[in-house]
């Protein structure tokens, strides 16, 4: 509403990933779609999205066995279409000491895999800039106030500092993130939308 990437888009985990943890809940389709998007972004925006290596240490006290994690990583790679450079493997014992900050007492295995990292705000601005180059118009700051669906498309209403405005479009894309349900409630006639579940997560990134 106020600026590009002013909300969740600049407060994400900074990762472009398939959601390794979603394999536990059987959300294979979600993981596959996310990994497909990761592959596309790595190809079209290599200056903004790059592969990042992750390590999974397995200790005597670790709840999951190494073979279970290896199976999950192999499924992750399979769903990702075995993308070049995004594979997984085991880190040899002789290389453990090179991993800064890794506690080696009780350590039994170290697995590694790859996902992608980005600057989410820069990526969002790049997407908007690309859309403008293809003919899109940007209204900012602006607040969506409502829309009416019709056979010929959709009439969209929004406000700017200059007052209320309206435009006609063939398609309305609801990309409001956490506010998607609020946006949907302002569309007439009422449409059924899936419930939006707000979740929180954290990734610690150390140089």
Model regions and ranges:
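Central beta-strand plus flanking loop segment that forms part of the substrate or channel wall
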Residues: 16, 191-207
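Core beta-strand elements of the Rossmann-like FAD/NAD(P) dinucleotide-binding domain
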Residues: 162-171, 175
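A conserved short coil-to-beta-strand element within the FAD-binding core of flavoproteins
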Residues: 140-155
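Dinucleotide-binding Rossmann-like beta1-alpha1 core, especially the glycine-rich loop
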Residues: 14-98
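Flavin (primarily FAD) binding-site architecture
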Residues: 174-190
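Helix-loop-beta segment of a Rossmann-like dinucleotide-binding subdomain
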Residues: 96-134, 155, 166-167
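Glycine-rich FAD pyrophosphate-binding loop
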Residues: 1-11
């Amino acid at each position: 509403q106020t600026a590009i990437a002013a909300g969740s888009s600049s407060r994400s985990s900074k990762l472009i990933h398939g959601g390794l943890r979603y394999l536990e809940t059987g959300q294979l389709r979600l993981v596959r779609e996310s990994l497909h998007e990761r592959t596309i972004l790595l190809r079209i925006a290599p200056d903004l999205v790059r592969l990042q290596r992750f390590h999974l240490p397995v200790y005597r006290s670790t709840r999951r066995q190494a073979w279970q994690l290896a199976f999950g990583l192999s499924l992750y790679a399979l769903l990702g279409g075995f993308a070049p450079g995004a594979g997984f493997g085991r880190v040899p014992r002789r290389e453990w000491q090179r991993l800064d900050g890794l506690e080696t007492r009780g350590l039994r295995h170290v697995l590694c895999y790859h996902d992608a990292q980005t600057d989410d705000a820069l990526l969002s601005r790049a997407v908007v800039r690309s859309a403008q180059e293809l003919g899109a118009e940007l209204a900012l700051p602006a607040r969506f106030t409502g829309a009416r669906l019709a056979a010929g498309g959709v009439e969209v209403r929004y406000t700017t500092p200059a007052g209320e405005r309206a435009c006609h479009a063939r398609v309305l894309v609801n990309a409001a993130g956490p506010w998607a349900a609020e946006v949907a409630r302002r569309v007439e006639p009422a449409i059924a939308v899936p419930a939006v579940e707000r979740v929180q997560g954290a990734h610690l990134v150390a140089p």
